[in-house]
Amino acid sequence: MTKKIITLVGRPNVGKSTLFNRLSIRKKAIVHDLPGVTRDRKYTDGKIGSFKFLLIDTPGLEENPDNMGKRLMEQTTQAILEADLICLMVDGRSGVLPDDKLLSSFVRKYNKHCILVVNKCEKAFDFDKEYYKLGFDSIVIISAEHGTGLIDLYDEIIAKLSIKESIERNIADPFRGDCLQIVVSGRPNAGKSTFINAIINDERLLTGPEAGITRESIEIDWQYKNTHIKLIDTAGLRKKSTITASLEKLSTSDTINAIKFANTVILMIDALAHLKQQDLNIANHIINEGRSIIIVVNKWDLVEESEKEAFQAEFYYQINTHLPQIKGVPVLFISAINKQNIEQVLDACLKIYKIWNKKITTGKLNEWLNFTTKVHTLPLQKCGRRVRIKYMTQTKTRPPTFKLFSNNPEKITDSYTRYLVNNMRDTFDMHGIPIRFTYVKNKNPYV
């Protein structure tokens, strides 16, 4: 049995994202008093009691939409078409507004199961007969923020979908289990959403020339070469000093959190804007979090053919100079809008994910260590004894982390550590990922 799909629809700031978070198994939507925070349709696994379902949050819709509003309407229309049940939400504090009437007419023409959800009813609620004039036979009064009325909502959902009380059993989920989480990150307007739309061949995410369209992380399940992938679109990251609005601070926090839990991060760079310090700052954050990373230069079709060779040479020089921690990181040049080289990006993600998970046997490690330290010996101490690394072992993967035992670890210089790390990359084919070394002092200083 596949999961039922429930779509939340309503004008801006009626509490759709609050209810989305309330019903979601884990919080996924940014909530803010500013209308219009949600701009893409957003999916999550939801649950009321023992009933599990797929929940879709949609952008708020208004009358007389501008160009952006028309694109938001397309997102909502697609979510309605996918739905088994629609929850049309209105604000109980403000009563029925013209936009509510417009939306009720819009929703009813699809002939879907529908519940009118009157939200923000924390206090004694004087029910307005105007709600009945919207044309729905099922009306539920709730407070999404405080969680009141959810039992009534549950009962209405069960009745509308004719679900029997066998819902305690697990509902089959084709995407259950391990998956490769790929976060697409970068500065605003680099083409992150356009890239994901190109991968899935669907205008799933809102795109346009305006910077900062994406305001929260959007997850999309996808299958590629027998691998379950979760593609995660994120809000663009700007310099801290340029972030002033509280909403953008929330969006930035959401992106940082997505990177923290990613397996692989695609750092998307706008070819027309070239490599900026903020791109390097984002890359360093990804590295510090220990994530695997690939660098994708988008809008390659807009670079003059005569300039491409010089562009690439300068780009590789900047990456190798400023990001030595990920020497050999994959760099791909694509056009997301033309779908040029986009599959190469996913191939690179699969490859670097395997490297990020690499485990090297202790025997091979110490054979390599013995040879490498003989080729380039460690320095002598003042007492005349040589600093030695006696033994090493791999303590974890994701990223590969190693513990090295030395008679005097504080005397091992950063330059010697870089020598070991770079040699390890070449020997074990571990290019493009962070590698971590931890030094431990031997109990016996004379060995």
Curated annotation (Swiss-Prot):
Swiss-Prot/TrEMBL GO biological process terms: ribosome biogenesis
Residues reported in the UniProt entry to bind GTP 2: 186-193, 233-237, 298-301
Stretches assigned to the EngA-type G domain: 4-165, 180-357
Domain of life: Bacteria
Keywords: GTP-binding, Nucleotide-binding, Repeat, Ribosome biogenesis
Residue sites binding GTP 1 per the record: 10-17, 57-61, 119-122
All residue ranges annotated as the KH-like domain in the record: 358-443
Pfam families the record matches: KH_dom-like, MMR_HSR1
Molecular function via GO: GTP binding
Family: Belongs to the TRAFAC class TrmE-Era-EngA-EngB-Septin-like GTPase superfamily. EngA (Der) GTPase family.
Quaternary structure note: Associates with the 50S ribosomal subunit.
Function: GTPase that plays an essential role in the late steps of ribosome biogenesis.
Protein's name according to its UniProt entry: GTPase Der
Lineage of origin: Bacteria, Pseudomonadati, Pseudomonadota, Alphaproteobacteria, Rickettsiales
